[in-house]
């Protein structure tokens, strides 16, 4: 054992030992309880960031702790390797995405391994390899045959210059990110999953997920968006039916969650793609031009919500189903063609969007809801929040519905509209079917062949993606590659589908493929699936709360219905780790933009309380402005390189710092002094163990503990109990605190009590081993403890050590603390009170007073009330 802590040397040696022994290889063992711990797998960008380090350290600590509880732990790792960033990098570097991706994977794997994670690398998966995505294609064929996957027209962002489809994030201010051209909305054939068929189950099963943060469950509830409303049909006037097909000519149908406001409808709005709008535009050039404008811009809902609302009258009219009034139909750029009926009723008095739209175009505003709260009266010139409420409201100006609240009006209107066959109650979901077609190269090929008579499933799987293409940004690479798409079907020329699947598909089922990554007889090995079942603990960022987690839940139900898994939900518990923050520094340019500098390049100035008051750039000595703590990012240039950190301090310091500085769910504010503090603690631990090892030539006699050392042993086991409790709660910062307190206890043990020192060191190393596995494994072996530390059980608390012969109680007189007394732990209440009254130290406070009563709070205090 070296006399100084050399992290690089010991970490390399321990990692090699683990690898040689396949220490963390997971094998099915029906005799042991399983624990499957999974952190969201990374995109292989080529470089780890501190968010990765924190995420995977949390998962590793949980995995190692569960291993100490005697469970058979599976902690795998893989690569979410398809996606647009690889295509962008390929264009920039003129290299095939496959080459770029595989190089990055090799580099990132080394970085992950340098952190000492207890990963079973034999189960590594890479989603861009055919041995993974072939089973995705196989499942596609099954679901396509059953109608769970279908094809229809879907709206996309189209760049008319680059002649390519753009993802929502590639549309910036309505323009293509590369060409700068105004983006158009286009409809093209796409493949969809019928996720809406599972909407109710996805919603209801959230109640089973007791181990998920309530915030995440609420986000999913809102995304699924179950609503109780009503379908209402507005008869189209005869002269407005021109150009409409028979099925579209009779009614304009809408869905609303506020049927109680139906008497306030003053117009209807339809999407530019609605049949009525298309018919009206046939002989209306101005309307046709406006509808063309509506088809420009992003199809992303977030963009649609913030864009200016515009409209144009169609010249067509419908009849109000209850009043018979004539209502104009407008085309509105805010109405979504792919959602509901692509038509909405306009109630300006009680919908903020409709209110501003009506003011913009001079449409009537009719109040039909009155508040029962003490609020300002309705004013058609100024929007107030209560106009849109439905709680503590009643209906007015609505015939025989007057005076009714929302629920009463809903029932009344249901009856009235049903009697006229013009409406009925309906439950609707915000969730829409999942369009998986992507007009991109670097993704899983869709196994479809198009031929003269329609389309068919590919008869040979996998349909292998060529890995030698280099995209140029000018449209789909596969659509420009005859060597890929040209094929034959039943002896005739045919064309292979050139769209690829949404990369969320790969990450929706990877948790199950880890169970049998090399299985060739099917998508999943039944024996492995029966044992591992589901993920016991999942770890990842809150940014994945909706799409990834919802799609993974959906896929689990699909796989269950195919008989491939036997669980309804993929992840029993979910931990969403907080962000890693760091200080930001910048200089503002003349034109208003900012140049950001890395904190490592800044000399920070602080006041006498340690607060930042400024800084200067080390390279030129000139001032830079402090921008506060923000999430580490490339854009703010405030990242910390994990590899540089590991090189300087070691992986255990990085792990200790990230676990100690903040609870897992909270944001972590980066501090160089904090990193140095973690490193100092490990050096002190090493030095203590070195001194201990060399101070004992042979096992010493067990010396009976005096009162001081009984108290030290009690404190050791108190901290062990605290650490065990906090491990169960994933509060690793307080686990480290308990370890540090325990370490302080060790320093109080006198030389003659080596048996107690050895017990304390053993407990300390075991407590810290999930967090700092390299140093604890090394010290464990150096101190000749049996076996290896990663195979040890978590130590049990010795309850006898926690028992105290005496306890200390506070003594109060008339509620004021006057001192303490020491009494036997098992003393009777009256004896305790008598002891307090007899103590001469309290006599001056009772002089001239008569004791009225005494109050005893068990194990805490005695209060003497005297007058």
Swiss-Prot record:
The keyword Aminoacyl-tRNA synthetase applies. PANTHER family: LEUCINE--TRNA LIGASE, MITOCHONDRIAL (PTHR43740:SF2), LEUCYL-TRNA SYNTHETASE (PTHR43740). Transmembrane segments: none annotated. It catalyses: tRNA(Leu) + L-leucine + ATP = L-leucyl-tRNA(Leu) + AMP + diphosphate. GO terms for biological process: leucyl-tRNA aminoacylation. It comes from Dichelobacter nodosus (strain VCS1703A). Belongs to the class-I aminoacyl-tRNA synthetase family. Keywords: Aminoacyl-tRNA synthetase, ATP-binding, Cytoplasm, Ligase, Nucleotide-binding, Protein biosynthesis. A motif ('KMSKS' region) lies at residues 631-635. Gene3D superfamilies: 2.20.28.290, 3.10.20.590, HUPs (3.40.50.620), Isoleucyl-tRNA Synthetase, Domain 1 (1.10.730.10), Valyl/Leucyl/Isoleucyl-tRNA synthetase, editing domain (3.90.740.10). Pfam families: Anticodon_1, tRNA-synt_1, tRNA-synt_1_2, tRNA-synt_1g. One of its GO terms (cellular component) is cytosol. This is Leucine--tRNA ligase. A motif ('HIGH' region) lies at residues 42-52. Its EC number is 6.1.1.4.
């Amino acid at each position: 054992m070296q006399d100084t802590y050399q992290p690089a040397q010991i970490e390399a040696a321990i990692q090699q030992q683990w690898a040689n022994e396949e220490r963390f290889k997971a094998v099915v063992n029906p005799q042991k309880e399983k624990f499957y711990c999974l952190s969201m797998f990374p995109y292989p960008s080529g470089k780890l960031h501190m968010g990765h380090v924190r995420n995977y350290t949390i998962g590793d600590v949980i995995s190692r702790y569960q291993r100490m509880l005697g469970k058979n732990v599976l902690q795998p790792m893989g690569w979410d390797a398809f996606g647009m960033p690889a295509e962008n990098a390929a264009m920039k570097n003129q290299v095939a995405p496959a080459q770029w991706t595989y190089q990055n994977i090799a580099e990132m794997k080394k970085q992950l391994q340098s952190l000492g994670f207890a990963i079973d690398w034999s189960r590594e998966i890479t989603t861009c390899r055919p041995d993974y995505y072939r089973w995705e294609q196989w499942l596609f064929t099954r679901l396509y045959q059953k109608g769970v996957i279908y094809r229809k027209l879907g709206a996309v962002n189209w760049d008319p210059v680059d002649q390519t489809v753009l993802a929502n994030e590639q549309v910036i201010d309505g323009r293509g990110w590369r060409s700068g051209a105004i983006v158009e909305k286009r409809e093209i054939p796409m493949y969809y999953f019928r996720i809406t068929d599972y909407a109710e189950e996805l919603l209801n099963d959230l109640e089973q997920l007791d181990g998920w943060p309530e915030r995440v469950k609420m986000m999913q509830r809102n995304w699924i968006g179950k609503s109780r409303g009503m379908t209402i049909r507005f008869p189209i006037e005869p002269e407005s039916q021109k150009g409409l097909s028979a099925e579209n000519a009779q009614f304009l149908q809408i869905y609303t969650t506020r049927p109680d406001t139906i008497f306030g409808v003053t117009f209807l709005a339809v999407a530019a793609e609605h049949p009525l709008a298309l018919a009206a535009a046939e002989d209306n050039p101005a309307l046709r031009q406006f509808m063309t404008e509506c088809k420009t811009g992003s199809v992303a809902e977030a963009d649609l919500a913030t864009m200016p609302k515009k409209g144009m009258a169609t010249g067509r009219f419908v009849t109000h189903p209850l009043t018979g009034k004539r209502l104009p139909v407008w085309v509105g750029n805010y109405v979504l063609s792919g959602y509901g009926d692509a038509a909405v009723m306009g109630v300006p008095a009680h919908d903020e969007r409709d209110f501003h739209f009506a003011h913009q175009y001079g449409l009537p505003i009719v109040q039909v809801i009155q508040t029962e709260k003490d609020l300002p009266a309705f004013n058609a010139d100024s929007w107030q929040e209560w106009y849109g409420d439905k709680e503590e409201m009643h209906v007015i100006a609505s015939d025989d519905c007057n005076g009714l609240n929302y629920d009463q009006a809903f029932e009344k209107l249901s009856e009235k509209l049903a009697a006229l066959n013009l409406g009925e109650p309906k439950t609707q979901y915000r969730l829409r079917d999942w369009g998986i077609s992507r007009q991109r190269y670097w993704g899983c090929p869709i196994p479809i062949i198009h031929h003269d008579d329609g389309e068919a499933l590919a008869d040979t799987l996998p349909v292998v993606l060529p890995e030698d293409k280099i995209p140029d940004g000018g449209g789909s690479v596969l659509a420009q590659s005859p060597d890929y798409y040209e094929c034959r079907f039943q002896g005739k020329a045919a064309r292979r589908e050139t769209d690829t699947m949404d990369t969320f598909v790969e990450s929706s089922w990877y948790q199950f493929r880890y169970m049998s990554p090399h299985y060739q007889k099917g998508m999943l090995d039944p024996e492995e699936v029966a044992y591992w079942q589901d993920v016991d603990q999942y770890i990842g960022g809150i940014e994945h709360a909706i799409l990834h987690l919802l799609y993974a839940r959906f896929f689990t139900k699909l796989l269950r219905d195919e008989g491939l898994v036997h669980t309804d939900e993929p992840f029993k518990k979910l931990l969403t780790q907080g962000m890693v923050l760091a200080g930001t520094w910048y200089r503002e340019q003349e034109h208003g933009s900012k140049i950001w500098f890395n904190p490592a390049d800044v000399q920070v100035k602080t006041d006498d309380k340690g607060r930042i008051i400024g800084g200067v750039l080390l390279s030129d000595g000139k001032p830079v402005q402090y921008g506060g703590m923000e999430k580490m990012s490339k854009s703010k240039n405030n990242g910390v390189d994990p590899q540089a950190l590991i090189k300087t301090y070691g992986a255990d310091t990085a792990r200790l710092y990230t676990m100690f500085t903040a609870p897992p769910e909270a944001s972590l504010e980066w501090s160089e002094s904090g990193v140095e503090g973690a490193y100092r603690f490990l050096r002190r631990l090493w030095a203590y163990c070195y001194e201990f090892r060399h101070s004992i030539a042979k096992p010493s006699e067990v010396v009976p503990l005096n009162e001081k050392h009984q108290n030290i042993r009690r404190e050791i086991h108190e901290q062990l109990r605290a650490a065990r409790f906090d491990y169960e709660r994933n509060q690793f910062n307080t686990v480290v605190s308990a370890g540090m307190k325990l370490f302080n206890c060790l320093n109080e043990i006198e030389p003659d009590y080596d048996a107690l020192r050895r017990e304390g060191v053993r407990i300390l190393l075991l407590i810290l081993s999930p967090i700092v596995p390299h140093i604890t494994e090394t010290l464990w072996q150096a101190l000749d403890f049996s076996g290896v530390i990663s195979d040890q059980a978590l130590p049990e608390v010795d309850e006898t050590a926690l028992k105290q012969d005496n306890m200390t109680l506070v003594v109060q007189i008339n509620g004021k603390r006057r001192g303490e007394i020491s009494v036997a732990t098992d003393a009777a209440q009256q004896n305790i009170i008598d002891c307090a009254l007899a103590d001469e130290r309290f006599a001056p406070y009772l002089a001239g007073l008569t004791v009225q009563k005494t109050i005893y709070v068990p194990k805490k205090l005695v209060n003497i009330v005297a007058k």
